[in-house]
From Swiss-Prot:
Gene that produces this protein: PSBO
Name of the protein this chain belongs to: Oxygen-evolving enhancer protein 1, chloroplastic
Subcellular location, record wording: Plastid, Chloroplast thylakoid membrane
Cell inner membrane among keywords: no
Family of this protein: Belongs to the PsbO family.
UniProt keyword annotation of rRNA-binding present: no
Amino acid sequence: EGAPKRLTYDEIQSKTYMEVKGTGTANQCPT
């Protein structure tokens, strides 16, 4: 992916959180 590496830790966490909630893997990843 050609995304610039300017993501902050919070942005990465938010992105992961949204992806996890969107795919339903939150049930598999208790973190």
